[in-house]
Amino acid sequence: ISSCLVSRMRVFVLTLLAMTAFAGNSLLSRLALKDTSIDAASFTSVRIISGALALWLIARMRGGTHSASGNWLSALALFLYAGGFSFAYVSLPAGTGALLLFGAVQVTMIGYGLWAGERLRKRQAAGFMFAFGGLIGLLLPGLSAPPLQGSVLMLGAGVAWGVYSLRGTSSGDATRITAGNFLRAVPFAGALSVAMLPWASLDSSGFWYAILSGAVASGLGYAIWYTALKGVRTTSAATVQLSVPVIAAVGG
């Protein structure tokens, strides 16, 4: 088997794992914010803190340099995504939220790729049109239109995640950089929780859902995604994320 084929298979497997983790995030978040009493700000904080701890442990076990990685701009994008994501899922179903999120991701990343001079292939153009058409169809007034506030929050989260993904395409050590971004996002999450303290609410089920979302679906999932991003073009990275709403819808 050629090294090129092995490399492509590795990227495919990593991408599949990352997309499954992303869908798991939608399902866990919706489950926690719909079926438990945890509030969106607390969910966001627990998710980011548990993701930071999980990634720090993984980075420590892998050894290598112990210097700080990541940067504050990526951390801010990560926090804006996580916060908007949580507050949006208070009112949105998992599948609808995922479609809005990754439709916005698609438009953001492909738009940047075109601006940077990348050419759009046929399947990527089809994915772009599907995402754009899906967003328009969802947001048009009608019986099936999702709540406006939740939709706007999720679209904002999608743009933030698109920016975060774009900033990860040229990364070095994916795990260490993602860990650094999560650690830097903790103060932002803490400030949000303090601001929302009068509405804070925690329960054990919601707490554990947030930990699973942070440590497994977010921390580990994002580290895998950053690794996979090294082997795909910006426009392809955007298109493949359209699989997430399908996985989330099938999962519930």
Feature-to-residue mapping (PLM):
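Specific alpha-helical transmembrane segments that line the substrate/conduction pathway
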Residues: 42-53, 78, 86-119, 157, ...
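Loop-to-transmembrane alpha-helix entry segments
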Residues: 67, 98-102, 115-137, 144-151, ...
